[in-house]
Amino acid sequence: MAAVGSPGSLESAPRIMRLVAECSRSGARAGELRLPHGTVATPVFMPVGTQATMKGITTEQLDSLGCRICLGNTYHLGLRPGPELIRKAQGLHGFMNWPHNLLTDSGGFQMVSLFSLSEVTEEGVHFRSPYDGEETLLSPERSVEIQNALGSDIIMQLDHVVSSTVTGPLVEEAMHRSVRWLDRCIAAHKHPDKQNLFAIIQGGLNADLRTTCLKEMTKRDVPGFAIGGLSGGESKAQFWKMVALSTSMLPKDKPRYLMGVGYATDLVVCVALGCDMFDCVYPTRTARFGSALVPTGNLQLKKKQYAKDFSPINPECPCPTCQTHSRAFLHALLHSDNTTALHHLTVHNIAYQLQLLSAVRSSILEQRFPDFVRNFMRTMYGDHSLCPAWAVEALASVGIMLT
């Protein structure tokens, strides 16, 4: 079935992005997202809280770290506790006591993560609940209905997600279906004045399919666009080229959200390619394995070399963990049955991600982003000759030479 040829009915989508500065050499941009629960400075990293909370950190702590937007998961929240209960709590903001902005994903990613429990048809995604086995249909209309009830500031269209390593006819089918589903999401959206619906670009690693999707979806006047279908196991060389293709065709005056990206090098490179927003479970997940993010990569604090190391994770980090606890203390906690260490590492890792993007933004505002990138890479890898080839190539494509 071909893609729907006529754009959806959403008219005069709000302009939520204000560009403040642009790098004179690369595609890096600094901006502001003007959202119902406050302004968000971009580029921005958005921590992920699947079920109205982040593992290992409270909303109060997240607030104190300077986070002004985080994520919730429509699929999981739609199943438990359910949209009706959350609506009675004045939406997801009230339910989780979060005063700042929220972005909810559509549930589409669960087509990949819960592949054995799902089946995709034109109607929507048929899931078997991982909680009780009950059959449920997540259609574009139902996804938007749930997100309208949640009251999130940014909502995502339901898209047909396939793994980035999949090739063949399914990739084209999923791309065209995502365009059709976007129109259904636009038609079903009840609160366009209060909630900003983003489209999600699909097309896998096929440049022609992704170009077709970009041309079709940018005909729809939605408030923002996400780059989907990447960061799922493809090579980094393939990854950055699809990101660059996408940003080259997306409207300059609307936010560009690169989904599922959270490694520090990836963040810096993709800002250079023109992306504004990022999310990933990486900083919280890696904390649960005893890994602390630092400018040189990460510290595996379970290793015995840290048993008598009384320095903080990062002496220059202002987060509560680094201001209060030593590597030796965290090492000892990690080797006990106490889960407190995971909490301390989660606080630090999220702080690291937020500080990194804040530093990136400052460098763009001060027109020193290329120098920032070179210093970042030198610190991370020790020598530019040791930088990943894909990152060197990607940065060179936008005029930032590491050598």
From Swiss-Prot:
It is a peripheral membrane protein. Queuine binds at D105, S106, G107, G108, F109, D159, Q202, G229. One of its GO terms (biological process) is tRNA-guanine transglycosylation. Disruption phenotype: Mice are viable and fertile but display cognitive defects, characterized by learning and memory deficits. Female mice are more severely affected than males. In the hippocampus, stalling of ribosomes on queuosine(34)-decoded codons is observed, as well as a global imbalance in translation elongation speed between codons that engage in weak and strong interactions with their cognate anticodons. Residues 260-266, 284-288 are annotated as: RNA binding. It catalyses: guanosine(34) in tRNA + queuine = queuosine(34) in tRNA + guanine. It is an enzyme of class 2 (transferase). The active site is at D105, D279. Transmembrane segments: none annotated. Zn(2+) binds at C317, C319, C322, H348. GO terms for molecular function: metal ion binding; protein heterodimerization activity; protein homodimerization activity; tRNA-guanosine(34) queuine transglycosylase activity. Keywords: Acetylation, Cytoplasm, Glycosyltransferase, Membrane, Metal-binding, Mitochondrion, Mitochondrion outer membrane, Nucleus, Phosphoprotein, Transferase, tRNA processing, Zinc. Its EC number is 2.4.2.64. The modification N-acetylalanine is found at A2. Expressed in brain, heart, kidney, liver, ling, skeletal muscle, spleen and testis. Catalytic subunit of the queuine tRNA-ribosyltransferase (TGT) that catalyzes the base-exchange of a guanine (G) residue with queuine (Q) at position 34 (anticodon wobble position) in tRNAs with GU(N) anticodons (tRNA-Asp, -Asn, -His and -Tyr), resulting in the hypermodified nucleoside queuosine (7-(((4,5-cis-dihydroxy-2-cyclopenten-1-yl)amino)methyl)-7-deazaguanosine). Catalysis occurs through a double-displacement mechanism. The nucleophile active site attacks the C1' of nucleotide 34 to detach the guanine base from the RNA, forming a covalent enzyme-RNA intermediate. NCBIfam families: Q_tRNA_tgt, tgt_general. This is Queuine tRNA-ribosyltransferase catalytic subunit 1. It comes from Mus musculus (Mouse).
